[in-house]
């Protein structure tokens, strides 16, 4: 299998970390949807990161579906078994994904010429990001987000979203405002599986 996309994408990185934790072997190729469009188009004409090329050449787009395929292949999931814990994990995973989505949206807005930026929209996505980070920080403070020993999807999503915020949009994510989330994410980043997939790998 081949996972395609840059690790500074929270979606690519979450898929890579999850696949590794599930014990799967796959190749990774750092191809940018911005700097290497022609190369990416040759792999997936949708130019969507991450993309997974399966062993039979099928291309799967969208990180959630790639993770679902990883679970199918491994015959297991990182999600908890107990119903109430599983539901909480789903909720927190969604919040982590929203945090990543809004941080990505902020970065995309900054790529626009200043005259084409819409201040009310920028304010909205920043507010959404901060709400998501507030919720994740509170969950980390309650011990609902951890760094293992058994990582859940919500732990991974939260840590990777925070890492992306600090790497790409640090001015919108000061550590002192969300210290519990920062501590949880820092503990995750110290794990071998996170070190295997560093956000700054070219």
Regions found by a protein language model. Give the residues of each.
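GST-like domain detector, emphasizing the conserved glutathione-binding G-site
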Residues: 1-119
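GST-like fold's C-terminal all-alpha helical module
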Residues: 96-184
């Amino acid at each position: 299998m081949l996972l395609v996309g840059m690790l500074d994408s929270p979606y690519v990185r979450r898929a890579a970390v999850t696949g590794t934790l599930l014990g799967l072997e796959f190749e990774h190729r750092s191809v940018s949807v911005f700097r290497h469009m022609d190369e990416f188009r040759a792999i997936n004409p949708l130019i969507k990161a991450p993309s997974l090329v399966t062993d039979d050449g099928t291309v799967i787009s969208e990180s959630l579906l790639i993770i679902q395929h990883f679970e199918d292949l491994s015959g297991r999931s990182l999600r908890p078994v107990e119903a109430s814990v599983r539901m909480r994990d789903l909720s927190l995973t969604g919040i982590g994904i929203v945090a990543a989505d809004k941080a990505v949206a902020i970065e995309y807005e900054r790529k626009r010429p200043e005259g084409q930026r819409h201040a009310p929209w920028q304010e909205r996505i920043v507010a959404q990001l901060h709400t998501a980070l507030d919720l994740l920080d509170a969950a980390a403070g309650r011990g609902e987000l951890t760094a293992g020993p058994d990582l859940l999807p919500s732990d991974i999503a939260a840590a990777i979203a925070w890492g992306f915020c600090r790497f790409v949009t640090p001015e919108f994510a000061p550590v002192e405002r969300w210290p519990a989330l920062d501590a949880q994410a820092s503990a995750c980043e110290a794990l071998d599986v996170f070190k295997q997939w560093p956000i700054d790998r070219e």
